Amino acid sequence: MSKLDDLIQKLCPDGVEYKPLSEIFNTRNGYTPSKKEKNFWENGTVPWFRMEDIRENGGILDHAMQYVSINAIKGDPFPANSIIVATSATIGEHALITVPSIANQRFTYLMIKNQYRNEYDPKFLYYYCFKLDEYCKECLNQGNFASVDMKKFSKFQFPRLPMEIQR
């Protein structure tokens, strides 16, 4: 048995509980501020993430290749330690974003609900989302444009493990 198996057996003697994505996270789609509004794109301070950021800088990100001004934001930026998941076009990629930010419309933000903040380690969720990536590829809507079936997406199951195991 592996060390992980030993920990699970020791700390979860009754088995591992699973929770659906929709119970653990609030979700919202990313967006692109209007390119016609020059002031949205000049002297920006809020990171705006695109697929290129993941490809160039990896899956745990604290800065973006492009920034937008606070005037470009609809409401508030998405909170730090959110996960972005590609749910259209290039499906099956994700990143942990460790700073307040926005991302383009290819991404769905997963923002952990307050009642689960102390129960999940952001890096554990990031690594577990590699399973979500594969699940997304199996849950596509039929049509001309590849996109994830969001009803199925919301049902994806995350294990509820003790922090000792997550870390």
What residues fall within each predicted segment?
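Short, structured motif recognition centered on aromatic/hydrophobic residues
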Residues: 16-24, 46, 81-84, 153
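Non-catalytic DNA-recognition/assembly elements of restriction-modification systems
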Residues: 7-31, 163
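Sequence-specific dsDNA recognition surfaces
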Residues: 22-37, 52-80
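Short, recurring structural edge motifs at helix starts
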Residues: 5-13, 35-38, 95, 144-145, ...
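Amphipathic alpha-helical segments
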Residues: 15-17, 121, 154-167
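Specificity-determining recognition surfaces
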Residues: 108, 127-158
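Short, compositionally biased
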Residues: 96-109
